[in-house]
Amino acid sequence: MNLNSIPAFDDNYIWVLNDEAGRCLIVDPGDAEPVLNAIAANNWQPEAIFLTHHHHDHVGGVKELVKKFPQIVVYGPQETQDKGTTQVVKDGETAFVLGHEFSVIATPGHTLGHICYFSKPYLFCGDTLFSGGCGRLFEGTASQMYQSLKKLSALPDDTLVCCAHEYTLSNMKFALSILPHDLSINDYYRKVKELRAKNQITLPVILKNERQINVFLRTEDIDLINVINEETLLQQPEERFAWLRSKKDRF
Protein backbone atom coordinates (compact mmCIF):
# COMPACT_ATOMS: atom_id res chain seq x y z
CA MET A 1 0.00 0.00 0.00
CA ASN A 2 1.23 3.48 -0.86
CA LEU A 3 0.20 6.56 1.14
CA ASN A 4 -0.15 9.82 -0.78
CA SER A 5 -1.05 13.34 0.35
CA ILE A 6 -2.77 15.81 -1.95
CA PRO A 7 -2.68 19.48 -0.86
CA ALA A 8 -5.99 21.34 -1.08
CA PHE A 9 -7.17 24.86 -0.19
CA ASP A 10 -4.76 26.72 2.13
CA ASP A 11 -3.75 23.93 4.49
CA ASN A 12 -5.84 20.78 3.89
CA TYR A 13 -4.48 17.38 2.96
CA ILE A 14 -6.57 14.82 1.11
CA TRP A 15 -5.08 11.38 1.78
CA VAL A 16 -5.04 8.64 -0.84
CA LEU A 17 -4.07 5.01 -0.28
CA ASN A 18 -3.37 2.94 -3.37
CA ASP A 19 -2.42 -0.69 -3.90
CA GLU A 20 -0.12 -2.22 -6.52
CA ALA A 21 -3.03 -2.70 -8.91
CA GLY A 22 -3.76 1.04 -8.80
CA ARG A 23 -7.00 0.77 -6.85
CA CYS A 24 -7.32 3.65 -4.40
CA LEU A 25 -9.10 4.96 -1.33
CA ILE A 26 -9.65 8.72 -0.97
CA VAL A 27 -10.03 10.35 2.45
CA ASP A 28 -11.95 13.62 3.03
CA PRO A 29 -11.93 15.05 -0.51
CA GLY A 30 -12.91 18.64 0.16
CA ASP A 31 -12.04 19.59 -3.41
CA ALA A 32 -12.42 17.30 -6.42
CA GLU A 33 -10.01 19.01 -8.82
CA PRO A 34 -6.65 18.11 -7.20
CA VAL A 35 -7.92 14.56 -6.64
CA LEU A 36 -8.97 14.15 -10.27
CA ASN A 37 -5.57 15.47 -11.38
CA ALA A 38 -3.78 12.94 -9.15
CA ILE A 39 -6.02 10.09 -10.35
CA ALA A 40 -5.22 10.93 -13.97
CA ALA A 41 -1.49 11.36 -13.33
CA ASN A 42 -1.18 8.04 -11.49
CA ASN A 43 -3.78 6.04 -13.42
CA TRP A 44 -5.60 5.16 -10.19
CA GLN A 45 -8.99 3.46 -10.05
CA PRO A 46 -10.98 4.88 -7.13
CA GLU A 47 -12.81 2.25 -5.07
CA ALA A 48 -13.94 4.14 -1.99
CA ILE A 49 -14.10 7.45 -0.15
CA PHE A 50 -13.85 7.83 3.63
CA LEU A 51 -15.47 10.88 5.24
CA THR A 52 -14.67 11.79 8.84
CA HIS A 53 -17.20 14.60 9.36
CA HIS A 54 -19.56 16.97 7.57
CA HIS A 55 -17.50 20.17 7.18
CA HIS A 56 -17.34 21.46 3.62
CA ASP A 57 -13.54 21.38 3.34
CA HIS A 58 -13.76 17.61 3.87
CA VAL A 59 -16.79 16.72 1.74
CA GLY A 60 -16.99 19.40 -0.97
CA GLY A 61 -15.52 17.23 -3.73
CA VAL A 62 -17.58 14.09 -3.12
CA LYS A 63 -20.43 14.69 -5.56
CA GLU A 64 -18.11 15.49 -8.46
CA LEU A 65 -15.96 12.42 -7.77
CA VAL A 66 -19.02 10.15 -7.56
CA LYS A 67 -20.34 11.63 -10.80
CA LYS A 68 -17.04 10.79 -12.50
CA PHE A 69 -16.67 7.38 -10.81
CA PRO A 70 -20.20 6.14 -10.01
CA GLN A 71 -18.93 2.80 -8.67
CA ILE A 72 -17.28 4.49 -5.66
CA VAL A 73 -18.61 3.53 -2.23
CA VAL A 74 -18.69 6.55 0.10
CA TYR A 75 -18.32 5.70 3.80
CA GLY A 76 -19.13 8.29 6.44
CA PRO A 77 -20.86 9.04 9.74
CA GLN A 78 -24.58 9.79 9.96
CA GLU A 79 -23.87 13.53 9.79
CA THR A 80 -22.52 13.13 6.23
CA GLN A 81 -25.56 11.32 4.85
CA ASP A 82 -26.62 14.41 2.89
CA LYS A 83 -23.05 15.00 1.65
CA GLY A 84 -22.89 11.99 -0.65
CA THR A 85 -22.35 9.13 1.81
CA THR A 86 -23.74 5.83 0.54
CA GLN A 87 -22.63 3.63 3.46
CA VAL A 88 -23.17 5.09 6.93
CA VAL A 89 -20.75 3.63 9.49
CA LYS A 90 -20.53 4.02 13.24
CA ASP A 91 -18.26 3.21 16.16
CA GLY A 92 -17.11 -0.41 16.29
CA GLU A 93 -18.04 -1.20 12.70
CA THR A 94 -15.57 -1.97 9.94
CA ALA A 95 -15.11 -0.94 6.33
CA PHE A 96 -13.41 -3.48 4.05
CA VAL A 97 -11.50 -1.56 1.37
CA LEU A 98 -8.53 -2.52 -0.85
CA GLY A 99 -8.34 -5.87 0.92
CA HIS A 100 -7.89 -4.20 4.32
CA GLU A 101 -10.25 -3.95 7.26
CA PHE A 102 -10.63 -0.42 8.66
CA SER A 103 -12.04 -0.02 12.15
CA VAL A 104 -14.41 2.90 12.69
CA ILE A 105 -13.74 4.89 15.87
CA ALA A 106 -16.24 7.47 17.13
CA THR A 107 -14.37 10.66 18.08
CA PRO A 108 -16.91 13.37 18.99
CA GLY A 109 -15.56 16.79 19.84
CA HIS A 110 -14.81 18.79 16.71
CA THR A 111 -18.26 17.73 15.51
CA LEU A 112 -20.67 15.47 17.38
CA GLY A 113 -20.59 12.74 14.74
CA HIS A 114 -16.88 12.81 13.86
CA ILE A 115 -15.31 9.41 13.20
CA CYS A 116 -11.81 8.13 12.44
CA TYR A 117 -10.66 5.10 10.45
CA PHE A 118 -7.84 2.78 11.51
CA SER A 119 -6.13 -0.10 9.74
CA LYS A 120 -2.66 -0.72 11.05
CA PRO A 121 -0.59 1.38 10.64
CA TYR A 122 -2.85 4.03 9.09
CA LEU A 123 -5.05 6.33 11.18
CA PHE A 124 -7.19 8.78 9.23
CA CYS A 125 -8.27 11.13 11.98
CA GLY A 126 -9.72 14.16 10.16
CA ASP A 127 -9.90 17.13 12.53
CA THR A 128 -9.68 15.24 15.83
CA LEU A 129 -5.93 14.81 16.33
CA PHE A 130 -3.36 17.10 14.71
CA SER A 131 0.38 16.90 15.09
CA GLY A 132 1.02 18.98 18.19
CA GLY A 133 -2.65 19.77 18.64
CA CYS A 134 -6.31 18.80 18.34
CA GLY A 135 -9.43 20.09 16.63
CA ARG A 136 -11.49 23.02 17.81
CA LEU A 137 -14.69 22.23 19.67
CA PHE A 138 -17.32 23.40 17.21
CA GLU A 139 -20.08 21.06 18.39
CA GLY A 140 -18.76 18.80 21.14
CA THR A 141 -17.46 19.37 24.66
CA ALA A 142 -13.94 19.35 26.06
CA SER A 143 -14.82 16.14 27.90
CA GLN A 144 -15.86 14.44 24.66
CA MET A 145 -12.69 15.52 22.87
CA TYR A 146 -10.53 14.39 25.77
CA GLN A 147 -12.09 10.92 25.64
CA SER A 148 -11.72 10.83 21.84
CA LEU A 149 -8.01 11.68 22.03
CA LYS A 150 -7.56 9.09 24.76
CA LYS A 151 -8.92 6.43 22.39
CA LEU A 152 -6.56 7.47 19.60
CA SER A 153 -3.55 7.74 21.92
CA ALA A 154 -4.11 4.11 22.95
CA LEU A 155 -3.51 2.83 19.41
CA PRO A 156 -0.21 1.04 18.64
CA ASP A 157 3.06 2.98 18.89
CA ASP A 158 3.81 2.66 15.16
CA THR A 159 0.47 4.12 14.07
CA LEU A 160 0.82 6.69 11.27
CA VAL A 161 -1.30 9.70 12.18
CA CYS A 162 -2.79 11.09 8.96
CA CYS A 163 -4.62 14.27 9.94
CA ALA A 164 -6.32 16.64 7.55
CA HIS A 165 -4.53 19.96 8.07
CA GLU A 166 -1.02 21.40 8.07
CA TYR A 167 -1.29 23.04 11.48
CA THR A 168 1.88 21.58 12.97
CA LEU A 169 4.04 24.71 13.14
CA SER A 170 1.41 26.85 14.86
CA ASN A 171 0.59 23.97 17.21
CA MET A 172 4.24 23.65 18.21
CA LYS A 173 4.49 27.38 18.87
CA PHE A 174 1.62 26.94 21.30
CA ALA A 175 3.30 23.89 22.88
CA LEU A 176 6.46 25.96 23.44
CA SER A 177 4.41 28.68 25.12
CA ILE A 178 3.24 26.06 27.63
CA LEU A 179 6.44 24.02 28.07
CA PRO A 180 9.28 26.26 26.80
CA HIS A 181 12.08 24.09 28.23
CA ASP A 182 10.81 20.68 27.09
CA LEU A 183 13.55 19.03 25.02
CA SER A 184 11.25 16.91 22.84
CA ILE A 185 9.04 19.88 22.02
CA ASN A 186 12.01 22.10 21.21
CA ASP A 187 13.62 19.47 18.97
CA TYR A 188 10.39 18.82 17.10
CA TYR A 189 9.67 22.53 16.71
CA ARG A 190 13.06 23.05 15.04
CA LYS A 191 12.44 20.10 12.70
CA VAL A 192 8.96 21.33 11.75
CA LYS A 193 10.21 24.89 11.24
CA GLU A 194 12.84 23.62 8.78
CA LEU A 195 10.30 21.52 6.88
CA ARG A 196 7.82 24.36 6.55
CA ALA A 197 10.55 26.79 5.46
CA LYS A 198 11.03 24.44 2.49
CA ASN A 199 7.24 24.16 2.05
CA GLN A 200 7.43 20.45 2.91
CA ILE A 201 4.69 18.41 4.59
CA THR A 202 5.10 17.54 8.29
CA LEU A 203 2.76 14.54 8.11
CA PRO A 204 2.11 11.73 8.73
CA VAL A 205 3.58 11.44 12.21
CA ILE A 206 4.28 8.34 14.30
CA LEU A 207 1.97 8.09 17.31
CA LYS A 208 4.79 7.13 19.70
CA ASN A 209 6.53 10.43 18.90
CA GLU A 210 3.29 12.39 18.92
CA ARG A 211 2.59 11.39 22.52
CA GLN A 212 5.85 13.10 23.52
CA ILE A 213 5.33 16.45 21.80
CA ASN A 214 1.55 16.97 21.87
CA VAL A 215 0.54 18.74 25.08
CA PHE A 216 -3.08 17.64 24.58
CA LEU A 217 -1.92 14.02 24.98
CA ARG A 218 0.15 14.84 28.08
CA THR A 219 -2.54 15.87 30.56
CA GLU A 220 -1.17 13.42 33.14
CA ASP A 221 2.44 14.57 32.65
CA ILE A 222 3.97 16.07 35.81
CA ASP A 223 5.69 18.92 33.94
CA LEU A 224 2.39 20.02 32.43
CA ILE A 225 0.55 19.61 35.73
CA ASN A 226 3.12 21.86 37.44
CA VAL A 227 2.67 24.56 34.79
CA ILE A 228 -1.11 24.50 35.16
CA ASN A 229 -0.86 24.48 38.95
CA GLU A 230 0.93 27.83 38.81
CA GLU A 231 -2.33 29.31 37.52
CA THR A 232 -5.06 27.03 38.86
CA LEU A 233 -5.41 23.71 40.69
CA LEU A 234 -7.10 21.15 38.47
CA GLN A 235 -7.36 17.60 39.78
CA GLN A 236 -8.63 15.74 36.71
CA PRO A 237 -6.86 15.28 33.35
CA GLU A 238 -10.12 16.21 31.60
CA GLU A 239 -10.08 19.58 33.38
CA ARG A 240 -6.46 20.11 32.38
CA PHE A 241 -7.36 19.31 28.78
CA ALA A 242 -10.18 21.88 28.87
CA TRP A 243 -7.71 24.46 30.28
CA LEU A 244 -5.29 23.76 27.42
CA ARG A 245 -8.00 23.90 24.75
CA SER A 246 -9.23 27.23 26.10
CA LYS A 247 -5.65 28.59 26.08
CA LYS A 248 -5.15 27.41 22.50
CA ASP A 249 -8.40 29.06 21.38
CA ARG A 250 -6.99 32.40 22.58
CA PHE A 251 -3.40 31.82 21.43
From Swiss-Prot:
Cofactor list: Zn(2+)
> What keywords were assigned to this record?
Hydrolase, Metal-binding, Zinc
EC identifiers of the protein? 3.1.2.6
Amino acids binding Zn(2+) 1: 53, 55, 110, 127
Q: Which InterPro entries match?
A: Clx_II_MBL, Glyoxalase_II_hydrolase, HAGH_C, Hydroxyacylglutathione_Hdrlase, Metallo-B-lactamas, RibonucZ/Hydroxyglut_hydro
**What are this entry's molecular-function GO terms?**
hydroxyacylglutathione hydrolase activity; metal ion binding
Specify the domain of life of the species encoding this protein. Bacteria
Residues annotated as binding Zn(2+) 2: 57-58, 127, 165
Q: Does the keyword DNA repair apply?
A: no
* Transmembrane residue ranges: none
- Kindly state which reaction or reactions the protein catalyses: an S-(2-hydroxyacyl)glutathione + H2O = a 2-hydroxy carboxylate + glutathione + H(+)
Which BP terms from GO are recorded?
Answer: methylglyoxal catabolic process to D-lactate via S-lactoyl-glutathione
Q: What class of enzyme is it?
A: hydrolase
Co-factor binding details: Binds 2 Zn(2+) ions per subunit.
Disulfide bond positions: none
* HAMAP family referenced in this protein's UniProt entry, alphabetically: Glyoxalase_2
**Stated role:** Thiolesterase that catalyzes the hydrolysis of S-D-lactoyl-glutathione to form glutathione and D-lactic acid.
According to its UniProt record, which protein family does this protein belong to?
A: Belongs to the metallo-beta-lactamase superfamily. Glyoxalase II family.
This protein's name: Hydroxyacylglutathione hydrolase
Which organism does this sequence originate in?
Answer: Escherichia coli (strain SMS-3-5 / SECEC)
